[in-house]
Every structure is written in C-alpha cells, then in structure tokens.
C-alpha cells in the first residue's frame, strides 16, 4: 500500500478542500490555504507533501489535474463526478422504465401508452442538458478535458437510446402489431437490451476493465436473427407491416450498438483502450 492509499482513506475531505482552494483561490502560501479551511499550516503541509513530491501540485500552488486523476481516479467523485453519475443513473432508470413500458405497449398494441412514452422522452433531453450544464460550469476546473468530452458523449448516447425507444413507440401508434407466436423472442430481446444498458452504466460508474457487453451484444444479434427468420416464415400480404417491423429491428440494433459505444468510451477514458473507429453495424458488414 503506497502513501496515497494510506492517506486518502481518512483525510479525503480535507485533501479535497485543499485542492479546491488551490484551484479556485490560487493561493501563494500554505498559510493562505490553512486560513481558508480553518486548519493548521502544518496539517496542510503534511497533506500536500505527497502531491508535491509527485509533481501533482507545484509552487506557487498549481494543480496538474491529469496527474491527479492518474494517481487517484476516485478523487473526481468528491467534487463533480458524484453529481454527474447521479444524473446518469437517473437516465438509466428512466430508460429501463421506458423499455418496460414500450414492451407492454408493443405486446398489447396500446397506442395510448405508446403516446405517453413519446412524451416521457423529453425528460431524457433535460437530463442530458443537465450533464452538459454541470460540465460547462465546472469541467475546466475539476476535470481533465478527456473526462468532460467523454461524459458529455456518454450522456448524449443515453439520450439517443431514449430516441430509439420513442421510435418504437411511434411504430405502435402507427399500428405495429406483433403476433403472439413471437412474444417469447421479443421478450428475450428486451431483456437483453436492459442487461446491456445496465452493464454499460456499470462500466461508467465502477470504471471496471472487464465487461460482458460484447457477449450480450452477440446474444442480442442471434436473437434478432431468430426473430426475423420466424417473422419471415409467417408470410403476410401487408407490406406496411414489414416496413414497420424493419424499423423496429433497426431501432433495437441501434440501441445495442449505443450501449457498446458507451462501454468503449468508458474503457478508453479509464484504461486508455482505443475505440474502434468503425461503427458496430459496419463491423458486422451491415449498412
């Protein structure tokens, strides 16, 4: 266990306060920091020493945020990340609820419920804007540029997931009905979508490196293929059904792709694992 690990466990709040004062007040001496926080200069010196030794803090008291995050990525929780993660969790909860609702609307051909889902989508737009406002107000002070850009992109991806759910709801409003004999397949697909979303947000929150997102993605596409084949076996004269069903499949596929994209963004941010520049659908040889 290094000095950082030992120190942060009991003195995180004071250390965060010191860093905040350095960033916001630009003090020239440790006495100024101590006076601002109501603690002794000796205590300030003790907490700052490891940061100065690692060149994370330089005199006259400038913080190298990139080094701070490399040494202790959990430090960002103390200042800004907690607020942003709370908003991302709210977006996840809204999306999971809307997935359940749109599945019910699809299963029961419930146009009124589908219309309500479309209206609910605006809540996700507001949450994405909330993240962007938080970042625009604070990111330059407390987060490296890579964090701000990645978190804004993750919030944008979550908002787009809401759009795909709203698109499915619109197809229900326009008359999309699925046969009873494919209910099990459709139920499995929505279960996988919820698992993929939950996994994506977990990677963002926990910063874990190992993820099952690609395994879930593979299961999703196998189930989509099974569903498509089953639908094509039951030939219909209504061409409009195939158009609507095709749009439904496309939105499901895009939902899964966005979940993978969120994980890729998080892995690049936290672990420097480069993202594949080729979109998921093109990697599968599909346009």
Swiss-Prot record:
Q: Look up the signal peptide feature and give its range.
A: none
What is one Gene Ontology biological process annotated in the Swiss-Prot or TrEMBL record?
intracellular phosphate ion homeostasis
Q: Which InterPro entries match?
A: P_transport_PhoU, PhoU-like_sf, PhoU_dom, WH_DNA-bd_sf
Q: What is the species of this protein?
A: Methanocaldococcus jannaschii (strain ATCC 43067 / DSM 2661 / JAL-1 / JCM 10045 / NBRC 100440) (Methanococcus jannaschii)
Note the SUPFAM superfamilies from the entry: PhoU-like, Winged helix' DNA-binding domain
The organism's place on the tree of life at top rank:
Archaea
Q: What is this protein called?
A: Uncharacterized protein MJ1641
